[in-house]
Amino acid sequence: MKYLVSLCCALLMLVACSKQPDNNIEAHKAAMKRFETMINTADSNIAKELVANNAPFYTPASPTPLYGGEGYLSVVHWMRQSFPDVQWKLEDMVAEGNVVAVRWTLSGTHEGEFMGMPATGKHCSTSVMNFYYFNDEGKVINDIAAEGMIGILRGIGALEK
């Protein structure tokens, strides 16, 4: 009986000390759904809520990083200069710890110059992949993108398929 009680205590300690699921994962995934709204509406209030002020973002339109929610939205505005109807659709999302990987479908009509290519009027769509990193306050602090530029350039006819 003494051994049974000891075994039960050991099992309880093992269960209690095992890694608990990260509740932040669900919060980060919910934040990414709001992020989708932010980039499709260019809502600066949502940007302030979701993106840390010191988060760097990179774009071919700027030789230096852009920072914070406004910096991220400047990337959105840059895309809208060429694709006024641009939309991002969240297709897949995987989260672990403080990182969320998202596969987006980016689509829009090429109505303005894009990276030196004059407007073609063509509608294009491509998949892009981003990894978003969150801080302890639940804000995005970094975004690493697997650029879909080849898909965009093929879609507007700048590259052959």
Can you describe what each PLM-predicted range is?
Residues 6-15:
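Bacterial N-terminal signal peptides
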Residues 35, 46-48, 55, 72, ...:
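Hydrophobic pocket/interface hotspot
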Residues 101, 125-154:
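Short beta-strand edge/turn micro-motifs at domain boundaries
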Residues 61, 94, 106-108, 147:
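A mature extracytoplasmic/lumenal domain signature
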Residues 17-53, 159-161:
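Short, low-complexity N-terminal intrinsically disordered segments enriched in polar/charged residues
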Residues 1-4:
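Positively charged n-region of N-terminal signal peptides that target proteins for export
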Residues 27, 44-97:
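A solvent-exposed, acidic/Ser-Thr-rich amphipathic alpha-helical stretch
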Residues 105-136:
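Exposed beta-sheet edge and beta->alpha loop/turn motif
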